[in-house]
Structure formats: C-alpha cells, structure tokens
Amino acid sequence: MNDIFAIPFKRALQINLKDAFTVVINNTFYQTAASVEADLTQLDKYRDVLFHLDVCQADLNMLKQYYMALKAIAVKLPDDQVEFTWFNTLGLKSSGMTRNSLRFETFNVLYNIGAMYSSLAVEQRLESTEGLKESCRLFKLSAGCFKFIYEHEVSNNFKFFDEYTLNALVSMMLAQAQQMVWKKACFDDIERHSILSRLALQVALFYQTASKNSNCSPYIRTDWVKSLTSKSHYFMAIAYYRSGLHQVQKQNYAQGICDFQYALTWINKLSLDDELTEWRGEVQALLESAERDNDLIYLQASVQNPSKVKPVMMVQADLFDEIEKKDGNIFKNLLPIDVLESCNAFNERVETYVKEHISNPLESMNKLLISNTPQYMDFKSYYISEQEWNSYSDSLQDLEQLRAYVAGELKLSESILQKDIQENEQMIREHGLLRWKIPSKDKKIESLLADLTNIRNYIENGMKVDTETASLFKTLDHDLVTNVSQPPESSDPIMKEASLILQGRKNHILAAERKIIENRLLPKIVSYYKKTGSKDFEPVFQEHIRMFDGDLLQVQKEKAKNKEMLTKVTLSSPEQVQISRNDPRTLYLEELKHSSNVLSELKENIISGKQFYQDLITALESKLKEIEDYVNERKLQRTELNDTLLCDTNES
C-alpha cells in the first residue's frame, strides 16, 4: 500500500504553430507576422518539449516557459483561431479532443505541468525526511495545477475537461501529499498514536473522495479506481489501529478493543499480501491481548462505537509562482486584441459622430428642401443598373429557350403517336381491314392528338406574347434608363440654385466620409498605448474628432442657407411654375417615367411567361408519359393479334 501515483502526461498532436499564428496575425491585425517572427519561432521551440518530455526540472521549466508564452499571446489574439488536439492518457485507451481554442492548449500544458510535479514527487527519496518533505511540496503543487484548471472550467461549463476527472486528480494528489506528512510523522515519533491516527484518517478521506470521483470519470482506468478504494480502506484501518493503540495507552481498554475491531473490518476489505497478512495478525493479537487484560483486570463495559477520530488536514493545493504570470518579453511588439477591439469601437464612434452631427443634418435639410420644391425632380428612383438591364435581355433569351424546349417535347410526343398510327396502317395492309380489328385512331388516340393540338396553340400564343415583349424592350432607350445620358439642366433659376445646394451637401457628406477613411484612429491609439500603456483612449478620441470642427461650422451655415432657400421657393411666382412645365428636365423625367412603366410591364410579362412555360413543360411531361404508356399497350395488342392471325393462316 506504499505505492503512489504519478499522473501520465497528456499527448498533443503536432502542428506548425508558427505557420498557424502567422496566418492569424496577418488576417486579423494591421501588423504583419514578420514583426514578431522571432517570437513565433521561439514559441514553436517551446512547444517541442511536449513531444519528448522527461521527468526532470529542465523540462518542467520548458513547460512553464511555453505556458507563460501562451498566456502572453492569448491576450493579444482571438481565442478561436487555431485548432489544437490533445489525447487523454489516464485510461487503457487513449481518447482525443480537438478544439479551436488557445485556452484549451494553455490548460492542457498546465495539466502536463501538474503531471510533471506528480512524477517528480514520486521520484524523491521517500526513505528520508527531506525527501518526504519535497515530495509533499511537489504533490501540493500538482494538486494546485489541477484545481486551477477545475476552477476555470466551472465558468466554462467543463468544455475542455471532465469535472469528475479533475476532482479525482486534485484529491489523489492531496491524499499523497498528506500521506507524505503521515509518513514523516511516523519517522519522527512512531509512538504518537493520536496524531498518527488523525493524519491517517485524513489520508483515507482524500483517497475516498478520489475513488468516488474516479469511479464517475469516463477516463480513469478501473485498476486505478480499485487501487484508490483499497488505499482509502488501508488508511482507514491505520487510523483506527492507531486510535486503538492510543486508547490502550490511556488504559481505555473497552474503547481500544472497539477501535481494533473496527480496524480489522477495514483490513478484511483488502486483498491481503504477505505484509498485510502479518499486520492483520498483529492487530488481531493486540485485540486479543486487550480483551484478555480487560476481562481479567480492568473489567470495563464493552463499547459499541469506534472512537470519534478528528482528521487533521496538513496539506492544501498550492500554486506555483508563475501560474498567473505571462512572459513579459515575448510578443511585446504585438498589440493586445482588446486594443484592436478598442480601435474598432472608437472607429464606430467616429462614424456615428459624423452621421449624427454632419450627414444626418445635411440629409434632413435636403429632404426638407426637396419636399418644399415641387419643381425639383428626383430621377434616381427611375434609373436601373447596367446589370439589371442585362438581366432583362437575358430573361428574354431564357423565354426563347423555354419555348424551343416545349416545342421540341411537343414534336416528340406527336411523332410517337404518328409512328404508332403508321405501324397500325401497315398491319391493316398486311392482314386486311376485315381481319385487323385494331383501329389506327381510336378514341384515346384522337383525344391525345387533340390535347397536343391545344398545347401547340398555347405555344403559338406564347410566341406572340414573347414577340410583343421583345419588341417592347427594343423601344427602350438604354442610355436613358441606365443614366448614361445625364439629365439636362433646368432653365428655372430657383431650380438651378436648389440643385447646386443639394449637390453641394451630398459632396460634403462624401468628403466627411472620406475624411473618416483617410484619418483612421488606429495609428493614434497605437502610439498612445505604446507611450502610456493606458487603455483609456477617450482623450485620443476627443482630440481626433476635432478634425470635423470645420464640418460642424458648415452644417450651421447650411441651416441658414436652407431657411433662405425655402423663403425663395415660397415667394416664387406662378410664371416659374409655368416655366417648369416646359423645362427640359420635366420632359426628360416624363420620358424616364414612361420607360420605367414599360420596364414594369416587361418584368411582369417575363415572370408570367416563365411560369407559363414551366406549366406547359409539366403538362407535356405528364402527357408524354401517358402517350408512351398507351402506345406500348397498343404495340402489345398488335403483337398478340398479329401472332394469332399468322397462326390461323398456317393452320389453314
């Protein structure tokens, strides 16, 4: 029962970490990966230790370096950009897990640091006091690693690790740390039965918790579960064996007898080797001796319950010094992701500021001026894009192709019926009309031919509509509806002035938007962060938006100009309204409106035309199947009748 557990290292799948992070940095940052190439190379070297781990202080230090480097880059990169795969090694079969997460990689490296501490603890000289103390320290650090992962996984809903497995590992490491304390106490004074009992009971309780959680874990092997259970029973037996010695030492023989009996119940649950068999004999002998002394000398009344031993916990999970630290030297030149996110947030604030204080007011003024200027004409709603124009042309060609397909299917259907009629006529010529009883055109054939004639009429009508639609499209002026030919200037002086004001405001909005693009906040925020280390970028934002002070002043001027213009429009004479009726822009708009109406009619014709041909295709496919089935039936009838007539001829 003196054997102790070392947690096996998890295994990782090899990846080229440098290449993976290079892609992420180049795609995510305004910086290039070349600026941190040396750091990426170093990170790759750190990760190499995962694939040739030895139980030694040097490899532990390498694991810690990699762990701290990961924590350094984790605050500067998105978490979900690189895929990592790790394999559990606690069971007889290895099972893998793959996640796109830097945190997943970081916690698995921390897991291996915990495993390394446990392996180093096992390798200490446990026959010496110093060896036991060092082993205890290392087991506590191992427990600290697993507990640290557990506490972070609670908030992560255990996406990366199993809850029971982590709990089992923490309890297992604490049990072994407590076991080292108990063993050292045995070395120090084997006769201090009370303290040894209390220390042993806490060891038993730790192992008991580890056993329960291991049993619920999907990863921990069964023989470990059994061993943990046995260890719990073993130290429970030790606790009450020592308690019995303590009670006998105090001449509480009845209580001592009860404790020895209780210790034996735990011993009997164990698989006994030679050493345990010998110890059971020793406990049995002590029990019998105590019973004899009590019966002959002390005559104490028998006790039914074992002593209430109070466990004493001498260990807790400890954290190694670097567990919360980041490597301060690696990736120094790479900006943290939250700084970049702040840049994006402040860029959005700049855009919102320009929209609220410049774009929206100018657009509102334009709308107000247009709504109060009846002569003003807005052509934009009537124009179509070159792509939309081409879509009309392509749709007309689609109609032609659909019509051609339907005509081809109709021709095929007609040819099948005509061939059947001709074959039947040939049989009539061979056997004579009196002997051949199958008509060339029965009612069904006549009905099918009539249906095909109706479909042909539909196709011809569709062709007429298609021709009219195509002719309608040809009447349109491409340059007019696609705004290739710009609208003429108005002859109305108020309209001319209004148009200039409206266009000037549109240009001002575009200029303000260009100013946003050409003067990004990112360089200023980067410079401010490098100078101060502060992530409070509000002063940078306030200084940045001062570039729009001139635009804000222009907005105020435009407000005054809008009032002046609205007054002019209100006071405009009826003659100006008459001018607008003969205005070149008015005539241009009328032609554009007419073209827009034609396009609406075209669109409706194309949509209904496509549906028309789709319906015809469906009807023809159904009719063709009906024709083929009936023609096959008639062929079978002709074959049977022909065979019968030939047989009669031969017999006669």
Swiss-Prot record:
PROSITE patterns linked to this entry: BRO1
Xref: InterPro entries: ALIX_V_dom, BRO1_dom, BRO1_sf
GO annotations of cellular component type: endosome
Pfam families: ALIX_LYPXL_bnd, BRO1
Annotated BRO1 domain residues: 3-369
UniProt record similarity statement: Belongs to the palA/RIM20 family.
Function: Required for the proteolytic cleavage of the transcription factor RIM101 in response to alkaline ambient pH. May act as a scaffold protein that recruits the calpain-like protease RIM13 via VPS32 to its substrate RIM101.
Subunit structure: Interacts with RIM101 by binding to its two YPX[LI] motifs.
Name of the protein in its database record: pH-response regulator protein palA/RIM20
Protein species of origin: Kluyveromyces lactis (strain ATCC 8585 / CBS 2359 / DSM 70799 / NBRC 1267 / NRRL Y-1140 / WM37) (Yeast)
